[in-house]
Design a protein with these regions (language model features):
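Small beta-barrel nucleic-acid-binding modules, primarily SNase/OB-fold domains
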Residues: 1-168
Length: 168
């Protein structure tokens, strides 16, 4: 492969090169793993190629699976994180214990474990695409909204995080 990089590209100062982003992308995503109630990995088909991303849901924050060791009520916090993770999996129709099935974008969406519709916004501070998740394309209510209405997650606008109420 013949490839030519200019000095400006190699030095990283060429501002004319766009930063890759999924901002405004909409499409199906096949969930491959769920970390907690607001972070998951999924595969999307982009320009005919499967690509895996770590996504962060927009609009809410869930308790952390690994809170700091000195945290007060740490066990309760972990319990709340597991509840949020399990609810997210259920709302997305994802079962990580289900047998692996090959997936292609032409399969019936109701028969694929963890196939969801996503709408991407900008990236968060860690570079993860921020997404609104829908169980099916055309659903009126997003998974994000259902998580917020459940009360086990906090509304989050990307700024200061609220502490979690451990009333379960």
């Amino acid at each position: 492969m013949n490839c030519c990089f200019t000095k400006r590209i190699l030095s990283g100062v060429d501002d004319s090169i766009p930063v890759f982003s999924l901002n405004n992308y909409e499409g199906y995503a096949k969930i491959t793993s769920v970390y907690d109630g607001d972070t998951f990995k999924a595969v999307i088909i982009l320009h005919g190629r499967p690509l895996k991303f770590t996504f962060r849901t927009i609009g809410y924050d869930s308790a952390e699976m690994k809170p700091s060791l000195g945290m007060r009520a740490r066990a309760d916090h972990i319990h709340l994180a597991r509840l949020a993770r399990d609810m997210f999996k259920e709302e997305c129709g994802f079962d990580d214990r289900a047998p692996f099935r090959l997936w292609n974008p032409f399969m019936c969406r109701n028969k694929v474990n963890g196939l969801v519709w996503i709408e991407c916004g900008k990236n968060d501070k860690y570079g993860r695409p921020l997404v609104t998740v829908y169980r099916h394309k055309g659903d009126k209510q997003s998974v994000n909204q259902k998580m917020i209405e459940s009360g086990i997650v906090n509304v989050y606008d990307g700024k200061k995080k609220d502490s979690f109420s451990l009333k379960i």
